[in-house]
Swiss-Prot record:
Family stated for the protein in its record: Belongs to the bacterial ribosomal protein bS20 family.
Biased composition regions of type Basic residues, renumbered to the chain: 1-12
Positions of the UniProt region annotated as Disordered: 1-34
Task of the protein: Binds directly to 16S ribosomal RNA.
Pfam family, one: Ribosomal_S20p
One Gene Ontology term of the molecular function aspect: structural constituent of ribosome
GO biological process, one term: translation
Keyword Flavoprotein: no
Protein name from the UniProt record: Small ribosomal subunit protein bS20
The entry's keywords: Ribonucleoprotein, Ribosomal protein, RNA-binding, rRNA-binding
GO CC field: cytosol; small ribosomal subunit
Keyword Ribosomal protein: yes
């Protein structure tokens, strides 16, 4: 990255685009990490519901897994195939005999 040249203008200076990209990519990375953490937490809660065997909590957990996987695709955090895989595995865990 080239050093900044002193400008003669008074007022806010423009930020070099490479520096701006670093800042925005870090913001995006933090946002994506927090959402992935929410996905993992939802999957863990669903797994606990499956282990408890309560039908109502399994149904609610499966619904929340589907919802959060679809939101991840919509936000561009997961690809569609990964979301489909997560949902298929959760569905298989919900009713293993079917």
């Amino acid at each position: 990255m080239a050093p900044r040249k002193p400008s003669k203008k008074v007022g806010p200076q423009k930020r070099p685009s490479a520096e701006k990209r670093v800042i925005t990519s870090k913001k995006k990375q933090l946002r994506n990490q927090s959402f992935k953490s929410r996905v993992k937490t939802t999957l863990k809660k669903f797994e606990l519901a499956v282990q408890s065997g309560d039908v109502a909590s399994i149904s609610a957990g499966l619904s929340s897994v589907y919802s959060i996987a679809d939101k991840a695709v919509k936000r561009g955090i997961f690809k569609k195939g990964k979301a489909d895989r997560v949902k298929a595995r959760a569905s298989g865990r919900a009713c293993p005999t079917a």
